[in-house]
Each structure stands twice: as C-alpha cells, then as structure tokens.
Amino acid sequence: MIELEEAREKMTQHMKSQCETEEVALLDSLGRISGETIFAETAIPHFPRAGMDGYAVRAVETRGATAESPSCLKVVGSLVAGDSMFYCNQTNNCAIKITTGAFIPTDFDAVVPQEWTDFGQDHVKIFRSVTAGQNYAEIGEDIAFQQKILAKHQQINSRMIGLLAMQGIDKVVVLKRMKVGILATGSELVSLEEPLSVGKIYNSNLYMLAAFVKASSNEVIHLDHCSDDPEELAKRLIEISPKLDVLITCGGVSVGEKDNLPLAIKRIGGTELFHFVNMKPGTPVMGSKFQETLILSVSGNPFAAMVNLHLFYWTLLATFFNCVELNLKERTVILAHELAPSRLRRFYRAKEIDGKVNLVTKSHLSSNLSNTLETNCLLEQPAGVLLKKGALVKVYYWQT
C-alpha cells in the first residue's frame, strides 16, 4: 500500500503531454485549453471614448465652477455611441453633448456628468469642475496594443472569450481534448433500459464517471460494460485501449473472487504502477499502463469511485495539458467538530462555509451517493490522527 501522493506521481510520470491542436469557433473554446499565445492587435478602446453620459469639455473651461457660479458653455453638437465623425470650428467655451461609449473629438479632454449640469440644449451650465482625463477613456485604457490576452496552456473562460471577441477573433486554436474511455465491470450490472431483477443493479457508475469527464470539457469516446470474466476483460482492454489517452475502469480491483481486473491487465502485458493506496474510501484503486494508454481503475462503490476519480483525475488532466489551473482545488479551513482517529487516511463528505467545514451526514458508507448532494468538498483526515474542534484541515472542492 502506498501514499496517495506517490500513486499520483507514478501516474503523472507516465502521462503524456498533449501537443496536438485544432481550431474551433470562439464560443466552442469555452473550457478548452489554449494552444497558442495571443497578443492584442487592436488597442481597446481604439479611440478616446466617454466614460458616462454628459458633456465633453475642455477641463480648463470648467475650473472654479460651482452651483452659485457655474461655467456656461455653448453646446455645439451631440455624439452618441457609434458616431465616428464630428467637426467643430469653435475652439473656446463650447461643449458636446455625449453618451457613454461615444467617440470624444480632439481637443476635448474630459466629460462632465450630466447630473452636474442643467441639461442644457443650446447652452449648458456646469456646476462642478472636472480635471483633464476625468470620465475620459484613453486609447488602450483596457487593452494595450500587443498586450498578452491569452497564454498557451491556459483554460479559456467567459472573460477571456470577451477579450478575444473585442479583438474580432472568431476562431481559437486549442489543444485537442483528452480521449477518455470508461469501462464498468461486473456481471451484476444491467443497462438503464433493462428491467431490474433481484441481484442486479443499474450501471449507474458508468454514467456518473462519464458525466464527470464531460464536465471537464474532455471527450468520452468509449463507454462500455464488461463482465467479471478475465478473458473477456482482457479482450475488451486490447480492443479499446489504443484509441484512448486514458481508460477509467470501475470495479473489479479489490480482493474478491470476481475482482479480476488486475489479472486481465497482467495477461495483456500491461504494467501495474500501483495497487492499493492509503486512503478510505477507495483503498483498492489501481494505476497501470498498457501500450500508450494510462489506466486508472477505481472502486466499484459509487462514493469510493467518485473519491478515487476526483483525487487522481485532476492531476492527470493538469499534466496532460500542462495547465496548473486544472489541478485539485484545495483550501485549509477550520474543523467545526471533533473527528475520531481513522486507521487509514480518510476523505469525508463535507460542506465548507465561510472557512469552517462540517460533516453533513453520519453515514459514510462508500456505497452511498445521495448524501453527497448536500456537500461541496471532501474533508481530509490524516491516518491515525484525532482531529479536535478548531483544528486546521484540508478540503478538496468538487469541481464538477
């Protein structure tokens, strides 16, 4: 039995890095990993623009303005967002009525908010002075020319898509998705469209694990079920592995009579990286490699399977895409109550709010899944340690 960190290290040492790219539509890049660094070709804004509704002025001509002694300027025109041209022959004591986002002509260097005026049409009274640059967005105030707006190996979010759209970019080069297969094992499993009979259960883990992978913006290209028979398992592994970057198997890794997955992997010439990790639930988790495909074999119990996948998958993903943002999201918080020692390193269903974490259920069976709906994280308890109320503990947040 090895520690979780050592097991993850053994997996990442054999995890290849994605170098292949593809071009996708801008909206389709959401959640994907950038395949190139992009620099701004256009400053934003690319013209001086008004920061609010009001009057474009020369700031010096508002100096000393008060309600009792306002500055009075001639309104020589108006500009709204989208207007591109304005000609003004008058050079002194004038103002332009203007809306937020509108182009500010040369020689005007500030905008007086309309609330500081009498809303005049031909002439406007200004009751407060402004300084040069006030409510005036200069060229490049948001994005400078040649500013980096997207780095290679960065996960693309909605804000980045907004910046790319500001540049008129409608297609993005991204790294190709990780190709993942999921194989659930067990003769007791039946497909969802079949009626249940005594001794049988629906193949729910298959869908839970597939949903987990899809939520991470990766591709499930094989979804299958296999019996516990070692010959059939070996045949199925040989068939599907070459198409995949990672194969996730579920069940068949413990020490029961029908737990034949380790045997099947050995028969096909696979390399076992580890089997059994100091963690609960999901102790019998196994990592292996067959040809170029990495295999993560998780527990057949639903909660244990989710814990195994959560604690291994994000590390593999971060390695595959060379993107640290994809790693496990963890935080040190305060334990709200005492936890008795556990022989193995333990991961509990928990809920963190405002820096404090509670167990939300008294049931911690690895076969139960419904009580995870009230949780937002896993609480870690080191092996053999009594955790007292107020202790600092690590939590790992659900990310799908």
Language-model region placement:
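Short beta-strand/loop turn elements enriched in aromatics
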Residues: 18, 22-26, 48-73, 107-121, ...
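Short, hydrophobic/aliphatic alpha-helical segments
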Residues: 29-43, 84-97, 287-288, 294
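Short, low-complexity N-terminal leaders and the immediately following helix N-cap/first helix
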Residues: 1-67, 74, 325-345
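Structural signal for hydrophobic packing residues in well-ordered secondary-structure cores
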Residues: 15-19, 37, 104, 147-153, ...
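Helix-rich terminal scaffold detector
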Residues: 1-4, 172-298, 302-308, 312
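Flexible glycine/proline-rich
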Residues: 2, 22-31, 36, 143, ...
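Short, glycine/charged-enriched hinge/interface segments at domain edges or termini
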Residues: 2-4, 56-222, 378, 397-399
